[in-house]
Amino acid sequence: MWHAISRTSRMSQSGCPSGLLADKNISSSATRVIVKTAGNQKDFMVADDISVRQFKEMLLAHFQCQMDQLVLVFMGCLLKDHDTLSQRGIMDGHTIYLVIKSKQGSRSLAHSFRDLPTNDPCHRDRNTKGNSSRVHQPTGMNQAPVELAHFVGSDAPKVHTQNLEVSHPECKAQMLENPSIQRLLSNMEFMWQFISEHLDTQQLMQQNPEVSRLLLDNSEILLQTLELARNLAMIQEIMQIQQPSQNLEYPLNPQPYLGLETMPGGNNALGQNYADINDQMLNSMQDPFGGNPFTALLAGQVLEQVQSSPPPPPPSQEQQDQLTQHPATRVIYNSSGGFSSNTSANDTLNKVNHTSKANTAMISTKGQSHICATRQPAWIPALPSIELTQQLQEEYKDATVSLSSSRQTLKGDLQLSDEQSSSQITGGMMQLLMNNPYLAAQIMLFTSMPQLSEQWRQQLPTFLQQTQISDLLSA
């Protein structure tokens, strides 16, 4: 059987309630709950395991209203119908705030609180031990803003958002701009007690004791927090700054470092990008041969590069073993004409800290022997002379420059150099031009003019004969 004892809202001259409930005959299984409304408060004796819905049904007989009009608030949180009082931590002597919504549903809770009486000078708060305690408010503070503060701190937007206009940002802005709320937030003593007695705050302080020392014991930090809560424009600005910083890792439309310094971790991300670029530049300068990302730009400077297949088996097994053991070998053919071709069998990546050396070898191709320079890493031993056969020409036929064309060019260049060196007349002519630069310049001028070059060609035998006579006289 539930017992209800009504308590009037009239206060004595001392500012305390006129009558207190003597609960000497209360059994241990029952709980005394104080229900506080806008005009009065009542004490109810309920069971420990009673649900919120059953408690609302009990309140309907006293307040003459419907079930959907009742809203119960405890410790800044709305009580749901399926919850029990013991689950929400409601114990003996705790205070539950009752809000009765209008039947039309047009008036918001903020508007209903504005019409509350303001003649009560003090407010009775909850106490876990069942004793009454008083929190004296400054002059001009009334009971209605205290109840409103409890309700504003609740999770009202999560439940019954279709009927509560408090979930709208406009209503929240009006509540924060209310002078009564501003005066309430400016009261440091009341806010300290309100925050410390909140259930979530108590759990937070139990898990993190440094929060109580940092926030509650430090009046300056608490004052800054309250100033931030009173300034709605500053809260909106912080939300706008935090919103893009959450998606900084995967931005939809990334801007080139736009406002990066104002975002958390912006300077760190900017410095990391600069550090990566500097590391790549330093690595390329200190290690120009291995892992250099800029070496690909020099690929166009190579005249002709031929990538060959594995080498054919030579006649001897010893040479075959040597070829398989030395995959990186470069052969450069040089002739008097200045022609060179570069052939690479397999360039390895581990040639960073190795220098290259040149060895000479004889290569015979159809009776023509030529001297070539073989470039290989220093850690590879020198290769013996390898005879290139006709099979090499078939393997390199798809290359940019074939060995057959290079052999013909080398042969022609060698024959031309032999003819030029064997001719005494040509040798004397070249010596004369070297000794007389002015004469060489005139000859170049004559070659550019057809008429002068024809006359020079006709007089050339006489000129050569005179030069031979002068050489004999000088000898």
Swiss-Prot record:
Single Gene Ontology MF annotation: polyubiquitin modification-dependent protein binding
Ranges where the record places region Disordered:
113-138, 305-325
Q: Which GO terms describe its biological process?
A: ubiquitin-dependent protein catabolic process
Q: Where is the composition biased (Polar residues)?
A: 129-138
* Domain Ubiquitin-like intervals: 31-105
GO CC terms in record: cytosol
From the record, give the cysteines joined by S-S bonds: none
Q: What is this protein called?
A: Ubiquilin-like protein
- Organism from which the protein derives: Homo sapiens
